[in-house]
Amino acid sequence: MLWLAAALCAGLAIQVWSAQATEPLDIGFYQPPGQLVLPAIPAERPRNVVVFIGDGMGLGQVSTARIRAVGPDGRLWMERMPVTGIVLTHSANSLVTDSAAAATAMACGIKTDNNIIGRDPNKPYRSILELARQRGLRTGLVVTKSITDATPAGFAAHVRHRDMQTVIAVQLLASRVDVMFGGGKAYFLPRDVTGSKRRDRRDLLEQARQAGYQYVEDLSGVKDCYHMVLGLFAMEAMTTMPPEPSLAEMTKAAIGVLDSAKDCNGLGLAKPGFLLMVEGSQIDTACHSNHLETMIRQLLLFDMAVKAGIEFASKDGQTLVLVTADHETGGLQIVPAPAAKGTKDEDEVQTRQLQTAWTNKVHTGQPVPLYAYGPGALLFTGVLDNTDIPKRLCGLLGIGPVPQPVEQTTVR
């Protein structure tokens, strides 16, 4: 294969993985969709928006997971969505973004430097989640790593470096996001508690309760009638294995709370609409390790969460679902499988065996896919910059506009 030889000569680290991995791939949880494209929803404006972000998810990752799960002619749930686009991901100071700058772009509508969250080097900017809350919409963040990690932080915090996770935890509570599910309990515990990552004695879990949050460590404790819920299911990143809740289960629970029409006394509530961000956080982790089987599993877990969003949107008729990524990780490619023995010309070999190659263990500058379904989906076709996403969402939801600097703030 000439491209492999050329890549090796250029000094690229090429790692080839076969679909016949040494570890069995457990995807028994995956429920594949039908093959028909979802029908368009005629409403022009959504009442609700669910944004799914697959961390590190490029087209190579999506295609590889599809082939392993449902075959080359099948479709994932996200691939059933009728509107597609391509998203450019560069940051202000690099052709290759990180999750902090990418989240800031998708939340605040600005390009910023890598590692910076919710601001540029000079000043902070409001996120679409903050603007939605000001407009009266309900808001939520659901992730499988720490809730203080770069992607969720980009939607509700403003710090000079993504590693300031103890500060981010304080800002998340101050932002009063209605529903927050994920890991990261260590950043909310006072320093004298085993496992705490804090250097002070602030008990943010107690502060959350005093602020009106119901704190849970198990989804069985979540009721739709709750107004504000903080669920931390691991000290740092979740394992994404039972007994922890799956991303799909957390997504369903978050939607249930955000869309609830009754309080816990059975009294009716107005349904102002909601904006929810759901991240498949650990696709990226697997790609950094070039671990193909883990990547496939994480992407399919993410796709099951997308399924939950699609099923709600199909019944609701007023919900826009977007699926995209912050960046691609690993430079994953699908390449020709080795030629059969005795074959003179490998180009003539017809094989459906999956063979993949990683080009690195870091982020890349590849554009990433975007899939859209629901009212307003047609605004997300074509080639978009990642800063275009919040700008168009602001128009659809009647909030914003972005970018919008924070005039007075106590953030650091």
Predicted regions located by residue number:
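Extracytoplasmic mature domains of secreted/periplasmic and thylakoid-lumen proteins
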Residues: N114-V170, R176
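Bacterial N-terminal signal peptides
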Residues: W3-Q15
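Active-site-adjacent structural elements in enzyme catalytic domains
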Residues: R45-R66, P121-R135
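A post-motif C-terminal structural segment
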Residues: T22-D26, A43-N48, M57-S63, I67-T104, ...
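Signal peptide processing junction and immediate N-terminal pro/mature segment
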Residues: Q15-T22
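A glycine- and small-residue-enriched flexible loop/hinge segment at structural boundaries
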Residues: D98-D120
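A short, compositionally biased domain-edge/stem linker segment
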Residues: I27-I41
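Structural motif
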Residues: F52, V142, L322-T324
